[in-house]
Amino acid sequence: MRRLSNQMLSGRRINFSRRGTDMTRRVRKAVFPVGGMGTRFLPATKAMPKEMLPVVDKPLIQYAVEEAQAAGIEHFIFVTGRGKGALEDHFDHAPQLERLLLERRKTKEIEAVTSWMPKSGQVSYTRQQEPMGLGHAVWCARDLVGDEPFAVLLPDDLVRAKVPCLRQMVDTYVEVGGNVVAVMDVPREHTKRYGILDVEKDDGRLARAKGLVEKPDPEVAPSTLSIIGRYILHPKVFDYLELQQRGAGGEIQLTDAMAKTIGSVPFHGLRFEGQRFDCGDKVGFLHANVVFALDREDLASDFREALRSIQI
């Protein structure tokens, strides 16, 4: 695994203004912004990264990585911060544990801790040295991404789907190129929680955007089509992130940079097939645990009985 700090990367700059015009090059790389403090889940996140919170028996970050693997991603880029050692350890082998499981012939357990791991050389880390917004976190990965399209996955957004959400997006990207984001309709009173598309054309599955607005008030929101934490982005977005302009909340917003690419890069929102859980919210996290437990053949029957026995 490669560990690269922002200082190490700063001496090696890429001229992002000289990009090719091929809008449908294969998406090989994914960025995972995982530098957040997880304050909404204190005290659980005092000593554990929020991305390591488990849904049933698997941490959120593993769900995101497995989704990326199913979409053909080959290079996994984690933008971390202080106190993320457990996350990095999760993507490394644990020889003592694996040896113990092997000695005890715990075949299923060995598979559970090794089968999904990216191969050596497929994982890179860089640091976001201060919390300056999602756009800044993505910008920190610029030299690792280079001059090619890339995905961004926010582990807080867990998607339950027959065809993984990012796989659906990659298939759509092959059709339309440019930027593709996963979107869902939300109640108008909730628009101030999300980035919202200003829609030019909408066929019910795919919406072509003419603009984006970050967390608009309901009365001025151009639509109710909100972006969730799944993106496929053209590298031109780095040209605008490079300007380090502050937006909503005084942070460098990814939405603002994406909006500026519209006109030079196609921009579409895909209504993905599946159910999204906001695991950055306690109720959403608990909801996900219930649904994913009921999906498990080894747990569903007993867990359903446990739910029926609850006295409220």
Where are these regions (language model features)?
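Catalytic-core segments of class I nucleotidyltransferases/pyrophosphorylases
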Residues: A151, V170-V174, D203-E305
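N-terminal glycine-rich phosphate-binding loop and ensuing alpha1 helix
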Residues: T24-L102, K106, Q128, P164-Q168
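Structural beta-sheet core signal
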Residues: F32, F78, V152, V181-A182, ...
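Conserved beta-loop-beta/alpha segment of the NTase-like Rossmann-fold superfamily
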Residues: L97-L100, T107, V113-V199, L233-P235, ...
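Basic polycationic patches enriched in arginine
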Residues: R2-R3, R12-R13, R18-R19
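Residues at the starts of beta-strands that form the adenosine-phosphate
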Residues: K29, E74-F76, Q122, P149, ...
